[in-house]
Amino acid sequence: MQEPLLGAEGPDYDTFPEKPPPSPGDRARVGTLQNKRVFLATFAAVLGNFSFGYALVYTSPVIPALERSLDPDLHLTKSQASWFGSVFTLGAAAGGLSAMILNDLLGRKLSIMFSAVPSAAGYALMAGAHGLWMLLLGRTLTGFAGGLTAACIPVYVSEIAPPGVRGALGATPQLMAVFGSLSLYALGLLLPWRWLAVAGEAPVLIMILLLSFMPNSPRFLLSRGRDEEALRALAWLRGTDVDVHWEFEQIQDNVRRQSSRVSWAEARAPHVCRPITVALLMRLLQQLTGITPILVYLQSIFDSTAVLLPPKDDAAIVGAVRLLSVLIAALTMDLAGRKVLLFVSAAIMFAANLTLGLYIHFGPRPLSPNSTAGLESESWGDLAQPLAAPAGYLTLVPLLATMLFIMGYAVGWGPITWLLMSEVLPLRARGVASGLCVLASWLTAFVLTKSFLPVVSTFGLQVPFFFFAAICLVSLVFTGCCVPETKGRSLEQIESFFRTGRRSFLR
């Protein structure tokens, strides 16, 4: 009797049968790692994630600046600031919805390239904004582009990457998003808010230029009957000195079995609905850990706590820690496995959120030298209560706890949820299902980001962090019960697993 996917004894979380002896295709796959073209194609695509990460945290230095603006057309009230921070996620949800159509209609590569249009237009609107409506529209357009790339880029990368490095390459979308956020934090120390928007145009233009010379996904080309073009694309990605026919036949056989789009009736079949459910719940839990409101209001959160360093510097430090952590995840994902990193990630985030919530509840009020804004006050420039004196190095707790949270998120639930989404979704439903996951993810992010400031004003800043800590505990249980280990398996092997008659891991 075969063992179930989860619950097997042993520390390695192996969820697949033992591998057969290396085939010619497995041996040839090693040679593909020496071909740099697949890395170039990945880099060209994930520049879209750089722009996404840059746009996501654009409000962190801009909201405090506009709060202090003397221009009545650009001065933000507390309510307007919450809309400016959260409307990005509404645009991202719309982008995820459009990806359900564009991913399979235009293909992965052209969909990524199409995202450059709303992204460039959004940055231009914010750079030349003369009123709130231009800021909101620009933010929505950059959000739309971010939602579209969030659904398309992981699929494209997973479909062009060899199994041996798919974990590392699958982490690059998150890595580039983090690098984009760090770039925004660093430039925010040097540039005024309008020039920050101008600088956001650069990665968009470079992405368009590089992707023009990259091939489309061989799996997408095969699904459209363009076999010769698919073979040329695979040979280009793997290198001319590698025999790609074994891998091509495996992909072709899988595509042939799924020559039509999945119907709603078929979507209820276990081998289709289970991986979609896992991917969807992972995306929801990822957002419910609090990552989006924390990043969007990062500088304002530091403004509202007793921090020893200037909030702008704190935000930049957190961005650097996030980048380093994602880099570590990218290097270890194919060694440690997905599940181990997810467990570690959720445990670290739980400890960080709980620590930050307890500090805010019992700790000192914000320090006057560094506090230019207060999340709990009606106006971020005026605090409702007198400020306490510094409490020494205790005031480093918000920075250290936030760094710990970002580190935990970046080594697991940040990059791995995107990677697993692209790995477990069946090919026939991959385009639509990835768009559905992104749509649900960003609708959740909008609700959290829009409600964050009202909840803080009504109940206190500690309440959201206690909620986020509870969600991290749920994530630990979900990882143990429902998430499969996909390390070292091809997309065809993963999909074949869900088609077997074994006991379901969804109990």
Swiss-Prot record:
Annotated positions binding a D-hexose: Q174, Q286, Q287, W418
Motif annotated as Dileucine internalization motif, chain positions: 5-6
GO terms (BP aspect): D-glucose transmembrane transport; dehydroascorbic acid transport; fructose transmembrane transport; hexose transmembrane transport; regulation of glycolytic process; transmembrane transport
Ranges of the Cytoplasmic topological domain: 1-37, 103-111, 162-168, 216-289, 336-339, 417-435, 484-507
Highest taxon in the source lineage: Eukaryota
Induction: By lipopolysaccharide (LPS).
Family: Belongs to the major facilitator superfamily. Sugar transporter (TC 2.A.1.1) family. Glucose transporter subfamily.
Protein name: Solute carrier family 2, facilitated glucose transporter member 6
Organism per entry: Homo sapiens
